[in-house]
């Protein structure tokens, strides 16, 4: 589809339907110009109306704030990205829905040095909000978090090697288990006999 007018989208839908049906007769759906629109995100300053020049000061503030929090900071990598999506859903009942989706990601990587040892930490926030998201408070939150995450790494010690019991709580532990052994239980790996568990299932 090279355009987003109703006529162009209907033409694309008909083409897709012909391909999917492979010549078989299917049920026709009549789409109307009526589209249901709901404001799901309370945006007061759309990103489309914000210039690059207006965004740069927040990157500069974040950079300066991180350097001011700890004299061990050697480098800061700050980034700000925004996007806006206009999505149109059409269902088999002939009803269409329009969705406006703003997105902003504001983040920083802090690199620190202590006694010749370098560490880095990351912090950021992503929201479906407009430019109103950019405040001095969010700058302070991200800066402090990036510095704290980096500073604590200098206190880290290497764990002992070998087998040991692991105690996991509810929540993210499921992801840890999946990444540790879950993939090896998947059918493809056992069918191809590339899994350690292929003879145990």
Describe every region a protein language model picked out.
Residues 1-201:
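Active-site bordering "gate/hinge" segments
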């Amino acid at each position: 589809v090279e355009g987003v007018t109703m006529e162009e989208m209907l033409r694309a839908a008909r083409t897709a339907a012909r391909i999917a049906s492979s010549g078989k007769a299917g049920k026709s759906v009549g789409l109307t110009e009526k589209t249901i629109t709901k404001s799901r995100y309370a945006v007061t300053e759309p990103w489309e109306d914000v210039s690059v020049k207006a965004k740069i000061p927040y990157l500069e503030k974040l950079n300066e704030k991180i350097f001011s929090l700890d004299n061990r900071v050697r480098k800061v990598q700050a980034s700000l990205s925004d996007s806006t999506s206009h999505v149109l859903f059409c269902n088999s009942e002939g009803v269409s829905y329009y969705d406006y989706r703003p997105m902003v990601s504001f983040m920083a990587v802090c690199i620190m040095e202590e006694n010749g040892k370098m560490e880095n930490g990351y912090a950021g926030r992503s929201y479906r909000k407009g430019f109103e998201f950019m405040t001095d408070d969010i700058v302070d939150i991200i800066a402090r978090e990036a510095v704290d995450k980096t500073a604590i790494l200098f206190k880290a010690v290497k764990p002992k090697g070998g087998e040991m019991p692991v105690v996991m709580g509810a929540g993210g532990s499921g992801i840890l288990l999946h990444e540790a052994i879950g993939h090896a239980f998947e059918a493809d790996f056992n069918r191809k006999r590339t899994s350690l568990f292929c003879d145990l299932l």
